[in-house]
Amino acid sequence: MWTLAGQGWWRGRALAAWVTEAARKGLLWPHLAPARGTAAESRAPDRCYSSADRKEKIDMSCFPVENTRNFSIIAHVDHGKSTLADRLLELTGAIDKTKNNKQVLDKLQVERERGITVKAQTASLFYNYEGKQYLLNLIDTPGHVDFSYEVSRSLSACQGVLLVVDANEGIQAQTVANFFLAFEAQLSIIPVINKIDLKNADPERVEKQIEKVFDIPGDECIKISAKLGTNVESVLDAVIKRIPFPKAHCRNPLRALVFDSTFDQYRGVIANVALFDGVVSKGDKIVSAHTQKTYEVNEVGVLNPNEQPTHKLYAGQVGYLIAGMKDVTEAQIGDTLYLHKQPVEPLPGFKSAKPMVFAGMYPVDQSEYNNLKSAIEKLTLNDSSVVVHRDSSLALGAGWRLGFLGLLHMEVFNQRLEQEYNASVILTTPTVPYKAVLSSAKLIKEYREKEITIINPAQFPDKSKVTEYLEPVVLGTIITPDEYTGKIMMLCQARRAVQKNMMYIDQNRVMLKYLFPLNEIVVDFYDSLKSLSSGYASFDYEDAGYQTAELVKMDILLNGSIVEELVTVVHKDKAYSVGKAICERLKDSLPRQLFEIAIQAALGSKIIARETVKAYRKNVLAKCYGGDITRKMKLLKRQAEGKKKLRKVGNVEVPKDAFIKVLKTQSDK
């Protein structure tokens, strides 16, 4: 053999050909040779590369409407929604049972890092119950108050919910809010008491809380441990028994509700749809009721929990649909899709998300403007609750004014921009949307409305132009151990809150309801509440409209010039404390100049706070080694006159780093 290898490359090829032929005849490895005359010999060779077309497709016609259940899991933060979803996926065989099954449906990096659910996720589960095969469509929802819009969207595709409550912590503020979301949507509610394996768990106490607050009989509660898998199977049985099947008909024309969507840079928009009527399959031509554009369906399927293509989707089922939508504005959440030339009455959509917090967003480097614009457009498709307006700043350049549902929502959006699109941004101090009622017909004609909304403090109108200012208010719910009630009530009073209700939900826990001005809770209220209650209190709020308020626009001046980026709107009673704090932070952030810098907070022409950045000072007396004192005084006087002149002609340039530092400290306060 070695002589063949040494005779040149062609002899090596001859050897390879001989080995191949010998292997085929079974001379080298007889046990691997195919048996003659068998099916193995006549069968075409298998393809050894992957192909999307060869995916095994599920026949969804096997699941009639009567055997379909659509449900969500709702709960307060960290009460075990995602863990329960993991166990349900394991029980139904959607995923293998391994120790690594943690937050399977939480696919975003930010969700895994923070241990929270941000995006509602769907999974279709196939479950055999009493000899029948059922299709259970599960939607895992977020628990934080900032993402309640995600919850309400998810509930529109469901007929029932699992209301998960921690057996140790009991009912919390977001539990109450989520219950009423499901109750108002007239969904079947199955209470599930989780974490019964904990040492301090008291499921009987929680059962009584559920009975008292929600008026649900205690015997309807299911006690489980999602972590250990204890009694989880009874949850699936209850879903089938207690949640009704969707009222849908395959014979009717197609009506599909788009309740969520994601963007894939290769396949375009992937729309999550709930079919209320009809059937949709690959090749169908569909029309968007919102844009009236026509598309051809490229792929339909279910999430199990990963994408699983199917031949068709039928009425009552929940799945995904890809139809060549390349523009991020084409997939509107709440839109109705129907078959071409078969128009239908559009389904009622969703209330548009109402931004509670606005902040300016600018690229760190203006050369990255177009990349950041593209990233924001794609991310707002996945998160349609973000409102975007173009904005510009003298110091920070071109950017946007973005509206968010809360501070956590803003932080998560910023983190997703960095992680998913590698975009670095500057975020300004968050503000809330105020309103002003204009005083004259001339102004009403100019603005085209009597009541204007102000999302940028720099555009806050002067008092002479308005009859009254309005600020947004929210109805807040606080649930706390009774030992912290006094401290929390004092905190609420300091935030200008008005008490509306107070009730004991059991012997040791109190539920307080307050009407808060939104700007008093938007930055640091939650942190203060947790600090005062040693982490035990929970907080949730809902929009309660607007109320009249004494608001003032506070300008920040550097040597008499207004810095627009630091203009803020505050309540008259808090103007001094807020102004002084901003001046102090700016003093620590600004670099010293050759002249003195006066940092002032002003309400109109009235200065209410001031800090001074001292000038660099040259020692002009260094060359004087004694002599007459008048010589020294003359030099010092000349230096002072020069500094005064320099201050008049010198413009204070605020470095971008100083802006970032001041704005970040203000929002982290």
UniProtKB/Swiss-Prot annotation:
Binding site for GTP: 75-82, 140-144, 194-197
Signal peptide: none
Transmembrane segments: none
Gene Ontology cellular component terms for the protein in this record: mitochondrial inner membrane; mitochondrial matrix; mitochondrion
A Pfam family this chain is assigned to: GTP_EFTU_D2
Presence of keyword Transit peptide: yes
Record's subcellular location: Mitochondrion inner membrane
GO biological process entries: positive regulation of translation; translation
Keywords: GTP-binding, Hydrolase, Membrane, Mitochondrion, Mitochondrion inner membrane, Nucleotide-binding, Protein biosynthesis, Transit peptide
Cross-referenced Gene3D superfamilies: 3.30.70.240, Elongation factor 4, C-terminal domain, Elongation Factor G (Translational Gtpase), domain 3, P-loop containing nucleotide triphosphate hydrolases, Translation factors
Domain tr-type G per the UniProt entry, residue ranges: 66-247
Reaction equations catalysed: GTP + H2O = GDP + phosphate + H(+)
One Gene Ontology molecular-function label: GTP binding
Membrane topology classification: Peripheral membrane protein
Highest taxon above the source species: Eukaryota
EC number: 3.6.5.-
Main location per the UniProt record: mitochondrion
UniProt transit peptide range: 1-49
UniProt family annotation: Belongs to the TRAFAC class translation factor GTPase superfamily. Classic translation factor GTPase family. LepA subfamily.
Known role: Promotes mitochondrial protein synthesis. May act as a fidelity factor of the translation reaction, by catalyzing a one-codon backward translocation of tRNAs on improperly translocated ribosomes. Binds to mitochondrial ribosomes in a GTP-dependent manner.
UniProt-recorded name of the protein: Translation factor GUF1, mitochondrial
Organism: Bos taurus
